[in-house]
């Protein structure tokens, strides 16, 4: 039995949730998101909470039970508060700037890298060495942050590159004579 899945997902104040078959839709102050559950999961809206239960006790249904509940909880948090991911840039001459809606990165290449964010994602650059990616979809925010980090990931000797703000880089010692 899933300890995560058996807890109903409370609908926070200020959010309207609707359940139509396998689809949960959440509308809140930040926008609207939906989640479509697998056919092996049943969804019900009871007492201002979404109850997630497996249709049968197969291994496949039980494995999707807790994940479905967590995804529904994630869309509620997204439309209420949103998600954000902070990135830091380390290195001499490495910096970020906004160019309209696009992000312009100087990362030591012969050219500047211009990143165009997808619809629903906003990027802010409070300092030239700090990038904040925000949006309502947790998966999309993480994907965009990973794509930006991928341009120049942190290297282990000096730590130069783009890294997550909460990431700890394991440093290596340089070669000795």
From Swiss-Prot:
Family, as annotated: Belongs to the universal ribosomal protein uL6 family.
An annotated Gene Ontology molecular function: structural constituent of ribosome
Any one GO BP annotation for this protein: cytoplasmic translation
GO cellular component term, pick one: cytosolic large ribosomal subunit
Pfam families named among the record's database cross-references: Ribosomal_L6
Entry annotated with the keyword Ribonucleoprotein: yes
Database matches in InterPro entries: Ribosomal_uL6-like, Ribosomal_uL6-like_a/b-dom_sf, Ribosomal_uL6_a/b-dom, Ribosomal_uL6_bac-type, Ribosomal_uL6_CS
Role according to the record: This protein binds to the 23S rRNA, and is important in its secondary structure. It is located near the subunit interface in the base of the L7/L12 stalk, and near the tRNA binding site of the peptidyltransferase center.
Keyword Signal: no
Signal sequence interval, chain numbering: none
Subunit record text: Part of the 50S ribosomal subunit.
PROSITE patterns listed in its UniProt record: RIBOSOMAL_L6_1 (PS00525)
Species annotation: Rhizobium etli (strain ATCC 51251 / DSM 11541 / JCM 21823 / NBRC 15573 / CFN 42)
PANTHER family, per database record: 60S/50S RIBOSOMAL PROTEIN L6/L9, LARGE RIBOSOMAL SUBUNIT PROTEIN UL6M
UniProt keyword annotations, A-Z: Ribonucleoprotein, Ribosomal protein, RNA-binding, rRNA-binding
Gene that specifies this protein: rplF
Highest taxon of the lineage: Bacteria
Protein's name according to its UniProt entry: Large ribosomal subunit protein uL6
């Amino acid at each position: 039995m899933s300890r995560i899945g058996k807890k109903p997902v409370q609908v926070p104040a200020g959010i309207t949730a609707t359940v139509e078959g396998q689809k949960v839709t959440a509308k809140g102050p930040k926008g609207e998101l939906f989640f479509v559950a697998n056919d092996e999961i049943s969804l019900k809206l009871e007492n201002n909470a979404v109850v997630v239960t497996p249709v049968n006790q197969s291994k496949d249904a039980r494995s999707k039970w807790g994940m479905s509940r967590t995804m529904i909880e994630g869309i509620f948090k997204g439309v209420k508060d949103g998600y954000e991911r902070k990135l830091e840039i380390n290195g001499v001459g490495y910096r970020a700037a906004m160019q309209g809606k696009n992000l312009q990165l100087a990362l030591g290449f012969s050219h500047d890298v211009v990143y165009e964010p997808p619809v629903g994602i906003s990027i802010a650059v409070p300092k030239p060495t700090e990038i904040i990616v925000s949006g309502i979809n947790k998966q999309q925010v993480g994907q965009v942050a990973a794509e930006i980090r991928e341009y120049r990931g942190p290297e282990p000797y000096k730590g130069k590159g783009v890294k997550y703000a909460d990431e700890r880089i394991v440093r290596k010692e340089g070669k000795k004579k």
